[in-house]
Amino acid sequence: LHEQKVTRVFAISFSFSFGLLITGTSWVYVSLHNFGGMHPVLAVIATVFLSAIFALPPAIIQTALAKLVSSPSRRMLIVFPVGLALSDWCRGWFLTGFPWLSIGYSQIPLSPLSNYAPLLGIYGVTLACAFCSGGVGYLFTYLSVNRANPKWKVGVILPTLILFLSIVLGSVRWTEKISQSAT
């Protein structure tokens, strides 16, 4: 979303969300066609329509944030991560739309970012992942444009801090065993 026009931000965000949703909702087609007896073409149309409807809010959120923030670096470091986490949260809570497709679940259980889950929940993991992605994107963008500009270091520092804090959080015992279970 770096240095993109607002209309292009909408198209990119919608395409990403639609791609995520269409792959995560293939079971809707199976339910409609195999179990509901719906004609295959109509089942495909219904699944595509459902995915497109659920892809609109993330695209609208990212577009609105991009309109508010014109700085390309702030878009990468703040707008993209906040917009991604906010749209995941909105889809999961307000639209009852497949919360298991949240980006944060891609980090559970093996990523160090999963250490944010006990404290911030899955949407906090999504936010941490998005901030790391924004930082890495920022790093590569600045390195490809102007290596002499020291601003590229932000792209290293942000993900490093997030990962370091995650490792620290991983050393905390969030629960403790009270007693042995009889079963």
Enumerate the predicted regions with their spans.
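Membrane-embedded alpha-helical bundles of multi-pass enzymes
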Residues: 1-179
